[in-house]
């Protein structure tokens, strides 16, 4: 099916939120059961709960959409949504969502593959990041703006890769006052069954990421790999990464056992900010041709923390730091008035 320069409008209400989130009920355009759909230009508008703009559901389903304007007004209404193993290819879209739980680039149970090139993606509701990933999502040359939420959320064994994107997140407060952190990018495991349990992956190459409130990265109840190269970071509160457990009040694992285990790789990356790791979490930091200005485990309460600096990397301390192991040349650490402790021993 091919649609060119069409206007699609969806009104009404939803009888079942999960059917809308998982299977596309109430979407303006739903492709399923192996359908092949191409949408070019035109406008998609919804004013219904679960009024996702364009929805790809099921293995073998492919949606190609380009140059389309998408507007959604109510909750649980993403701009483009992919679930159940579907595929979405989007280029140069103009997407804006207003409701809560309405990511501009949205996925849910069963995931799939999403490729986005160019375009603008804006969200205005709470719990509405520009990208919510329970899928494999790659985005290049796009502007991603979350005005009342994190910029990106990765749940479970899924990934987000950004190339030359401009991202900003402005989480105004904790959801219903029951969240424990404010951040720009969250990587976690919810235990809801919407995402497979396993290592999450986030990668950013080039572009700019701005946190207008809270930490840059927050990792809890999961393991993940974060790769950063040539990104310009603008920090809100001075914390680059917070890998910690949570109270489990929202079902995110068992308290005391739900930390964040992070492997972070910096390649040709300059960044300023602290790294916080609690006693049930861990960090493996690998720096190549990079500069980090900040403290790691300044309060000496973290779990296993290893740091590797290659000969072309520099670590500028902003406080006393405590790590389990260090691999590199001590001369590449600018300590100033501070000290680095490795396994309890002061080395600089």
State where each predicted segment sits.
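Hydrophobic residues embedded in beta-strands of well-ordered beta-sheets
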Residues: 88, 137, 159-160
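Glycine-rich beta-solenoid repeat tracts in large extracellular/virion proteins
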Residues: 1, 16, 25-33, 52-58, ...
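Extracellular beta-strand/loop-rich repeat segments of large surface/secreted proteins
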Residues: 276-348
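Beta-strand-rich solenoid/repeat architectures in extracellular/passenger domains
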Residues: 2-24, 36-50, 61, 66-76, ...
